[in-house]
Amino acid sequence: MTMPFIKKISIIFILFTITICSAETIGRVMKANGEVLIKPIGSGTYSVSVKLGQAISNGDAIRVGEASFAVVIFLDDKSVVKIKENTDFQFVETSNTRSLIIEQGTTLHNVNSKDRKKDYRVETPVSVASVKGTEFSAFHDAVAGVDKFVGKSGNFDVFNSISGMTVNVGAGQKAVSNAMGQLIPAPAEPGDYPEDPEGDSPEEEQEEQDQPE
């Protein structure tokens, strides 16, 4: 075989492997209300209307419309993300990292430290929140270039991608990060933590999931 032929075969194999990995089912939609759409990996549009039990594949993006919400559970560690109205983001996983790439909107996270084998991150154009086992919310205003992260339990780090600053956020604390490079920690105030779209606490939901059938 000639070297160009071998190189061509190698490239095809790598692209095939990436495609297979990207198509891996990483989560499922537990609940959905209103307009909830999926943009499958490789697609340019939000073309799939979500149904209960809908598979979420690595690389998929989700859009939750006005007066709508969705709840997604990750299959490996049973971590849960609740997605509030007017939110868009993409699920991206590697062998050691789980990232939610937020374009806009508000998400509530209950990250299960038990059985978790990957780093859990929430990324916006401005900030990166690196999470261990904790419960927190993330809000990104795409127009203003402002993020707000609020801790409810546990702790996590927030990194401002512009300035390189990092702060640790614990329970009852928040961090406001913006496109000017500012990263401001402060005590959380009443109303900072978004209302749960289901009206249930993530702790109660996690306990229900852990109960044997």
Describe each PLM feature range:
Residues 1-10:
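Bacterial N-terminal signal peptides that target proteins for export
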Residues 15-22:
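Hydrophobic h-region of N-terminal signal peptides that target proteins for export
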